[in-house]
């Protein structure tokens, strides 16, 4: 995988989609027009269209930055142009900085690894387990070095023998005490 990584619109603290419950919560004219078009034509029910917008609306990335658990997530003392995500009391910059296992610090570790390991930037990409629908895995090679990455984006632990019997240094994982398989929502880099 080539390219420049970027961290965008609250991802560094784990901000999520807003999942607005009413079309009145949306401000994006594209979302509002699509809602009207699809519901009035009968192509989708109001509920189906709202479920679609919860996943794809640009307004998901336009909610105010969640700085802390105070009113309006610490973004403003006024009225924001769009509603603050309802999870701001749990997901916010202040809470992230106070939790050494937060998404924020995980991103910092990943950025540090990228700066310290040329293989992450310059290594040749090879897909692994390409027939496995549950695990996204690949390796990068650079000279004699090999970096293996395994990611499980499912909601269940998945059996995997990718690392079995192999020596290497675990560079980062978001699960500390796993025994077998690839845990739920798991990322693992081994050099």
How would you label these PLM feature ranges?
Residues 187-191:
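Conserved small/polar residues in nucleotide/adenosyl-binding loops
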Residues 1-147, 153-158:
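Loop/helix patches that line or flank the sugar-binding groove of alpha-linked glycan CAZymes
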Residues 60, 115, 167, 174-178:
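Residue-level signal for pocket-adjacent positions within structured domains
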Residues 121, 125, 163-166, 179:
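Intrinsically disordered, low-complexity segments enriched in small/polar residues
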Residues 157-175:
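Beta-strand-rich binding/interaction modules
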Residues 178-186:
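Short, intrinsically disordered, charge-balanced linker/junction segments flanking boundaries
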